[in-house]
């Protein structure tokens, strides 16, 4: 098993979730966390990189939210790596992802990333109804930690 699989399985057990990553690194594990987002565990075999992705569940993603996310891509540092936002064109949906080399990956990355993903999903829900400030006006480290 890769570092990624071992760490992901340990993390899932720690939050009382039973879905486990299999030995097949080609697959992805998608966990619907709440109505706003899903967490995706994936692995890029070509670069031996672990991919932690937050997917926003509404399709298409609200344009105000997309604009904020894309304008602020690469501005959030989580667990020593950039949280990069992007757009899946086929579904007009946004995502955020962190890519970490498998050789560096351990369960502490997941423990640091998961709460940030939860906060991003809460912010996302607030922006959709006009209740959240724009990301650009915030102190990012304080906003997400």
Residue ranges of model-derived segments:
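Charge-rich, low-complexity N-terminal segments
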Residues: 1-39, 79-82, 86
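A short local loop/turn or secondary-structure capping micro-motif enriched for an aromatic residue
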Residues: 48-49, 60-61, 103-106
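Ampiphathic alpha-helical segments that act as solvent-exposed interaction surfaces
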Residues: 68-78, 99-132
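Short, aliphatic-rich beta-strand segments
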Residues: 94-98
